[in-house]
Amino acid sequence: LPICTGLLESGSIHFIFKDFILKNYIEILKNYDYIIYTRFDQFYTGNHIEGRPDKILIPEGEDYFGVCDRHAVIPRKFITEYLRICEYIDSKATSKYPSSYLNCETTYLNQLQENGLSAYIERIERYQFTASLKNDKTNWRISKYRLFGYNDLYIKYPDEFIDSMYNKLKNHSLYKVIMEEFSLFINYLNLITRRKLGKYKRQFFKI
């Protein structure tokens, strides 16, 4: 790389995957109207959203000063440019963007801006969250919240889970959510109750 990108370990892996797909499977991807680019550790709280013409669908949240890089639905006509992130990193175009804080999300957004794709981004309500097994290797967040009702599975980013379940409850009746996703609903109640109790505890004891 011509400059220090600030992208180490898991950040570099994200981009290598995209470059590998671009160089080896792009013609296969062109057989599909939409391509879902996602991580293996996503737990969905409902059916996957359908793609939309002329829109790159990215869930809300987890932007870290850029844009969330964990999931996207891309129309076929955008997929080649979308995957060219390593070409962007190796180009002089990187000098056009601030480098005081670089991570996966900021570099991802810079690349989409450079490739002319940022104008097509549409943020959608989150309907999935990141999960992990207890002993999964991680470079960043260590999972602390157990997902009760699921064998040895943990919630990695609590905000993702809470947002996903909040959206599900907002868009469906309480009866439907309880009947279809009872375990997730109980976990949601448990997590938001813990947060509220923690907030009151800090206020009462001035922690």
What are these regions (language model features)?
Residues 1-207:
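ER/Golgi luminal nucleotide-sugar-dependent glycosyltransferases, focusing on the catalytic module
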